[in-house]
Swiss-Prot record:
Any one cellular-component term (Gene Ontology): cytoplasm
Protein name: Ribosomal RNA large subunit methyltransferase H
Similarity-based family: Belongs to the RNA methyltransferase RlmH family.
Entry EC no(s): 2.1.1.177
Catalytically driven reaction(s): pseudouridine(1915) in 23S rRNA + S-adenosyl-L-methionine = N(3)-methylpseudouridine(1915) in 23S rRNA + S-adenosyl-L-homocysteine + H(+)
Gene name, Swiss-Prot/TrEMBL: rlmH
Assembly and binders: Homodimer.
Keywords for this protein: Cytoplasm, Methyltransferase, rRNA processing, S-adenosyl-L-methionine, Transferase
Amino acid sequence: MNIKIIVIGKIRNEFIKAGVNEYLKRLLPFINIKIEFLPSFSELSEKIALLKEEEIILKNLRNGEFIITLDKDGEKISSEEFSKKLFKLPISQNSQITFIIGGIYGVSEKIKQSSNFILSLSSMTFTHEFALLILLEQIYRALKIQRNEPYHY
C-alpha cells in the first residue's frame, strides 16, 4: 500500500515531530508512506490563502490517486470503519491513497470536490500538526486492526 500525506504548513512542535517520527517508524515496514509539507499562506487573507494553497495542492496530485481530505465537516467514522475503508479501497498496487490536511483555513471547496472521501477526525478542530499525528496514529491502528494484532503494548 502506498500512502502520501499532503500537509499545509510545517511541524513546529518538537513533541509532535517525535510522535510523527515514531509512527512513521512503526508504519514503514508495512506501508510505503511519505509526507509532503507544502507552504502555508496563513499571513494572507482567508480567500487568497485558500486559493494559493489549492493551487499547490492540485499540483501535487496525480491521476489515479484515491484522495481523502480531512475536514471538520467530513464523515465521522470509527477506527474499525476506517480500517475497513482503508484496506478495502479499490486501488491497484501501484496507485496510492493521498490524504490532504489543510492549513489554518482548512481546504477550498475545489479540493473537497476533487476528493473521493472527506474524513473528519473529530467534531473538534485541530492544528495541522495535531491532525497529522492523529492521522498517523489512526493509520497505524487501522493496520493493527487489519492484521488482527493487538494495538496496546
